[in-house]
Amino acid sequence: MAIFEGSFTSASTLKVGIVIARFNDLITNKILSGCLDCLKRHGLDTSELSNQVDIVWVPGSFELPIAAKTLMKKKSYDVVIALGAVIRGETSHYDVVISEASKGISQVSNENNVPIIFGVLTTDTMQQALERAGIKNNLGWNYALQAIEMGSLIKNLN
């Protein structure tokens, strides 16, 4: 019986793309910082001159799938991380954005056989978003760990 798992020790060989929504940037900037910190601590070069990590900013979470798709056509990535923050308001806009962003990200991932980590916070309040972006825990770190694990797993399976 063969057992395959992702590795956290081979992260330094990964090529990572990050697509990030500018909307709610108070939150998304914090998530990005946590994400980059984790990648750096696991051996990736996150400097501005890095050819290991690319970052693409988009207006909002709805635009994440098309940016991820376009990014993957431009270069070869082992994994992409989609970051955003959607906070429930008084209208149904929240439901539409989350539904379409999650479907689109999943579709792009499956079509390109590249894992895309769904790092879009979905919260009812700004306070909940702040807690998940660093006050209590920075989920950006968790999203980066998922990316390292999935990127190395798919690399090993191929």
From Swiss-Prot:
Enzyme class per UniProt: transferase
Residues annotated as catalytic: 93
Assigned keywords, A-Z: Riboflavin biosynthesis, Transferase
Enzyme Commission no: 2.5.1.78
Database matches in Pfam families: DMRL_synthase
Chemical reaction(s) catalysed: (2S)-2-hydroxy-3-oxobutyl phosphate + 5-amino-6-(D-ribitylamino)uracil = 6,7-dimethyl-8-(1-D-ribityl)lumazine + phosphate + 2 H2O + H(+)
Pathway(s) annotated for this protein in UniProt: Cofactor biosynthesis; riboflavin biosynthesis; riboflavin from 2-hydroxy-3-oxobutyl phosphate and 5-amino-6-(D-ribitylamino)uracil: step 1/2
Residues bound to (2S)-2-hydroxy-3-oxobutyl phosphate: 90-91, 132
GO biological process, alphabetically ordered: riboflavin biosynthetic process
GO molecular function, one term: 6,7-dimethyl-8-ribityllumazine synthase activity
Record: residues binding 5-amino-6-(D-ribitylamino)uracil: 23, 61-63, 85-87, 118
Matching InterPro entries: LS, LS/RS, LS/RS_sf
Cellular component GO terms, alphabetical: cytosol; riboflavin synthase complex
Matches recorded under PANTHER family: 6,7-DIMETHYL-8-RIBITYLLUMAZINE SYNTHASE, 6,7-DIMETHYL-8-RIBITYLLUMAZINE SYNTHASE DMRL SYNTHASE LUMAZINE SYNTHASE
Function comment: Catalyzes the formation of 6,7-dimethyl-8-ribityllumazine by condensation of 5-amino-6-(D-ribitylamino)uracil with 3,4-dihydroxy-2-butanone 4-phosphate. This is the penultimate step in the biosynthesis of riboflavin.
Similarity remark: Belongs to the DMRL synthase family.
HAMAP family listed in its UniProt record: Lumazine_synth
Entry protein name: 6,7-dimethyl-8-ribityllumazine synthase
Species name: Prochlorococcus marinus (strain MIT 9312)
Gene that produces this protein: ribH
